[in-house]
From Swiss-Prot:
UniProtKB keywords: Metal-binding, Zinc
Any Pfam family matching the protein: YacG
Region of interest: Disordered: 44-82
Subunit and interaction comment: Interacts with GyrB.
Protein name: DNA gyrase inhibitor YacG
InterPro entries: DNA_gyrase_inhibitor_YacG, Znf_NHR/GATA
Organism: Rhodopirellula baltica (strain DSM 10527 / NCIMB 13988 / SH1)
Length: 82
């Protein structure tokens, strides 16, 4: 087991030994829950720049599923029996 190290809590900044808390890397369960709340409220997050190839998602309604797409209208589908 590694010896404890002094670290700063990312929520409150308090300096503590790493073996003092089960809520690592936070100094307490309270600080851990404060951080979780910030993530859930989208106050903090990971930076992300969209890929230039990312396109908006188009959703189909049920009517779109009953007809083949224009690209596939000429394809024939076969069922194979076992």
């Amino acid at each position: 087991m590694e010896p404890p190290v002094k670290i700063n809590c990312p929520t409150c900044g308090r300096r503590f030994l790493s073996d003092e808390t089960p809520a690592m890397p936070f100094c307490s369960k309270r600080c851990q829950l404060i951080d979780l709340g910030r993530w859930m409220n989208e106050e903090i997050g990971l930076p992300h720049e969209g890929d230039p190839g990312d396109a908006p998602v188009e959703y189909l309604d049920d009517r779109d599923l009953t007809q083949p797409s224009p690209e596939r209208q000429n394809e024939s589908f076969h069922r194979y029996s076992e």
